[in-house]
Amino acid sequence: DKTNSIYTYNRDFANAKNPVNMNITAPQPFSGTYVEKTLQAKAYPSVKVCSKVNSGLISFYKDYPQCDFSVYVGAPVSQEVQQTVLPSLQAAIQGKKQSEAANILINFVQTAFDYKTDGDQFGYEKPFFVDELFYYPYSDCEDRAVLYSYLVRTLMGLDVVLLEYPNHMATAVCFDENIDGDYITVSGKT
């Protein structure tokens, strides 16, 4: 029903059939001040990260249209976050079995950040890019799933998939070793 539609230009382009690609494929260079934050895992007090994030990048992400979660998972993480976050976490999992390393990372992701829903924090749904977790005071399940998937892929080299449930999101990890527990099969991998 066109009477209830909003147009920026009321004309149909017959050849315009491709949706807009919102993927961010290269790091976004922004000037701005750096915001630093210290985060610590509760079950592993020696796992401490002093992060640094560019406020200019956060301003860019603040107004970014809400997208499919693959956009957040696939977006590059800033050099600042990579350089300040990854070395401490890499050292914490060095030499550990995959299951132990994954548990250290999930404990960091679940306990170093305070929880609040997007509705409570912003008044609307706002999925985060990885850098945003190190800026805002709160995060929720989909933000943490995106961060955990990044850490597991980057630090452990394992495949992951996001699992979307009603009002919840989690990350499944494809381990190279046998792990007790529930599993799913995606593209022939368990």
Regions found by a protein language model. Give the residues of each.
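Secondary-structure boundary elements
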Residues: 69-134
